[in-house]
C-alpha cells in the first residue's frame, strides 16, 4: 500500500500584518509596525503549494480562521456592534485589536500534532490540536483548528481526534513544530522525537533555562500527546531544546532542525545534552539513520535564525530515494548558508541532491519559513480517500484560489487599517466564498 506525506499548508488570511506579537520571535519583533502586503503573502503561499504539487507531492491546505475574532474582543470587554467593538479596541488597546486580527493561523505547523497510523496501537491517524497558550494571538486558534481537523478527517474508522490539552502553563503545547518523525520511509513505523523547552512539574533536572525569551513547549504536554496517541514508548524520545538557542530566537524546534524519513538535519547547538539525544536516536533506529549535524563554525545559531535554514522543508519525491531541500530565498542570499547548502547537495554521503529556493518574504518577515507553513499528515491510500477532498490541491484549484485572492485581498495593510470596519466585511465576504470553493459548508462562526 502507498503511504504519502500530505503537506497541509495554511492559506494566508486577509489580515496578515506585522505587529510584533510574539516574544522570542526575532523577525516578528524586528518588523513590528511595518506595512504588509496580504495579497502578496497569500500568493507566495499558493506558489509554494503549486511548486510542491507539481513535484508530485500530495498537497492540501487549511483555510484562514475568521478574523477579526469578535468573540475574543467581547471577552476582553469590548461590547457593541462589530464596528463599535473595533473602534473601542483601536482607541484604548490597539495591541489587543491587533491580536484579534492576527493571521498567524497560516503557520499550520503549530495547528496540531499528528501521529501516523503505522505508529499507533489502534492503527489510526491521531490528531491533537495545539492549545497554543503561550500567546494570546495564537491561543485563539486552538478551538477552530480542532473543528477544522475534525471536519476534514471525520471518518472515525481511520482518524482519532483528542481534546486539547488543558489550557495551563503546565501543559503548554505548540504542535508539530516541536515534533519530528524519523523512519526508513513514510510507510514504515518511525521514531517519534518530541522536543520541549521546559519541565514544569516535579523535579527540575536542568541547570539552565532560557533567560531572555520564554520556553513554550512543556515536557508534560509532549508526554501527554505520546500517551494519548498510543505510541510505543520504546519508539519515543523526549529531548530538551537548548535554552541558549531559545534565547537566540529558536522559539520552536523547527527553527533549528528538520527531519524527513531517515535523514535528520540539525544544528550542533539544537538540544540540551545533544550527544545523548543523537545517541538515543541511533540506538532506537532499526534503519540506516543519516544525521547531518551543522557546526557553529559553518553556521551560527543567529545565522540559522536569520535565514531559517532549518525551517526548510526536506522532501522525498515520489518513486525516488533522493531528497530536495525547499529553502527560503534568504538562505540563497546569505553566502555562508548557501555555501553550506551547496556542500550538502554535493555530498554523496546523504540523499539530499538538490535545493529549491522559495520567495516567502511576507511570511518570513513575521518569523515563518517553508516548514512553519505546513502541517505534515502521513496517510495511506485508504486514509487519503477517506478525508475531505475539497481541500486537496491541484492546479485548477490553485488557479481559482489565486483569482479569489486577487478579488478580496488588499495589497497594503498598516496597523491603522485595522480600525477600518470595512476590513471586517471584506474578510467575511471572502471567507463565505472560500467555504463554497473548498466545500466546507458553514464552518465559520458568522455562518451559523
UniProtKB/Swiss-Prot annotation:
Disulfide bonds listed in the record: none
Signal sequence range: none
GO biological process terms on file: arginine catabolic process to glutamate; arginine catabolic process to succinate
EC category: hydrolase
Residues binding substrate: 19-28, 110, 137-138, 216, 254, 366
Enzyme Commission (EC) number: 3.5.3.23
Family per similarity comment: Belongs to the succinylarginine dihydrolase family.
Job description of the protein: Catalyzes the hydrolysis of N(2)-succinylarginine into N(2)-succinylornithine, ammonia and CO(2).
Assembly mode: Homodimer.
Protein name as annotated: N-succinylarginine dihydrolase
Organism the protein comes from: Legionella pneumophila (strain Lens)
Amino acid at each position: 500500500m502507498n503511504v504519502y506525506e500530505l503537506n497541509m499548508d495554511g492559506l494566508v488570511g486577509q489580515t496578515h500584518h506585522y505587529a510584533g506579537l510574539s516574544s522570542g520571535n526575532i523577525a516578528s519583533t524586528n518588523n513590528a509596525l511595518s506595512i504588509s502586503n496580504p495579497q502578496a503573502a497569500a500568493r507566495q503561499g499558493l506558489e509554494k503549494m503549486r511548486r510542491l504539487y507539481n513535484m508530485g507531492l500530495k498537497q492540501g491546505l487549511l483555510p484562514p480562521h475568521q478574523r477579526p475574532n469578535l468573540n475574543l474582543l467581547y471577552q476582553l470587554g469590548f461590547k457593541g456592534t462589530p464596528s463599535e467593538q473595533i473602534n473601542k479596541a483601536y482607541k484604548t488597546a490597539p495591541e489587543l485589536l491587533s491580536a484579534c486580527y492576527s493571521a498567524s493561523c497560516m503557520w499550520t505547523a503549530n495547528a496540531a500534532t499528528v501521529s501516523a497510523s503505522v505508529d499507533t496501537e489502534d492503527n489510526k491517524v491521531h490528531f491533537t490540536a495545539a492549545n497554543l497558550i503561550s500567546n494570546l494571538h495564537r491561543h485563539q486558534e486552538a478551538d477552530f483548528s480542532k473543528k477544522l481537523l475534525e471536519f476534514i478527517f471525520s471518518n472515525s474508522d481511520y482518524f482519532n481526534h483528542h481534546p486539547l490539552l488543558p489550557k495551563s502553563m503546565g501543559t503548554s503545547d505548540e504542535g508539530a513544530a516541536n515534533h519530528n518523525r524519523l523512519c526508513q520511509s513514510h510507510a514504515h513505523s518511525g521514531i517519534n522525537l518530541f522536543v520541549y523547552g521546559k519541565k514544569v512539574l516535579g523535579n527540575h533536572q536542568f541547570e539552565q533555562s532560557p533567560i531572555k525569551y520564554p520556553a513554550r513547549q512543556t515536557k508534560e504536554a509532549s508526554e501527554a500527546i505520546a500517551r494519548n496517541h498510543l505510541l510505543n514508548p520504546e519508539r519515543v524520545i523526549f529531548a530538551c531544546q537548548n535554552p541558549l538557542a531559545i534565547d537566540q530566537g529558536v522559539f520552536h524546534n523547527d527553527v533549528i532542525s528538520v527531519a524527513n524519513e531517515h535523514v535528520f538535519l540539525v544544528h550542533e547547538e539544537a538540544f540540551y545534552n545533544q550527544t545523548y539525544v543523537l545517541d538515543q536516536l541511533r540506538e532506537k533506529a532499526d534503519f540506516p539513520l543519516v544525521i547531518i549535524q551543522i557546526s557553529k563554525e559553518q553556521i551560527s545559531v543567529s545565522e540559522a535564525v536569520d535565514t531559517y535554514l532549518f525551517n526548510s522543508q526536506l522532501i522525498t519525491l515520489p518513486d525516488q530515494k533522493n531528497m530536495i531541500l525547499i529553502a527560503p530565498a534568504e538562505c540563497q542570499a546569505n553566502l555562508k548558508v548557501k555555501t553550506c547548502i551547496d556542500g550538502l547537495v554535493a555530498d554523496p554521503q546523504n540523499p539530499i541532491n538538490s535545493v529549491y529556493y522559495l520567495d516567502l518574504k511576507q511570511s518570513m518577515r513575521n518569523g515563518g519559513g517553508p516548514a512553519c507553513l505546513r502541517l505534515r499528515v502521513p496517510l495511506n491510500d485508504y486514509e487519503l480517500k477517506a478525508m475531505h477532498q475539497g481541500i486537496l490541491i491541484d492546479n485548477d484549484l490553485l488557479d481559482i484560489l489565486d483569482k479569489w485572492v486577487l478579488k478580496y485581498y488588499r495589497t497594503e495593510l498598516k496597523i491603522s487599517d485595522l480600525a477600518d470596519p470595512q476590513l471586517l466585511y471584506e474578510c467575511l465576504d471572502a471567507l463565505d466564498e472560500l467555504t463554497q470553493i473548498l466545500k466546507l459548508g458553514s464552518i465559520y462562526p458568522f455562518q451559523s
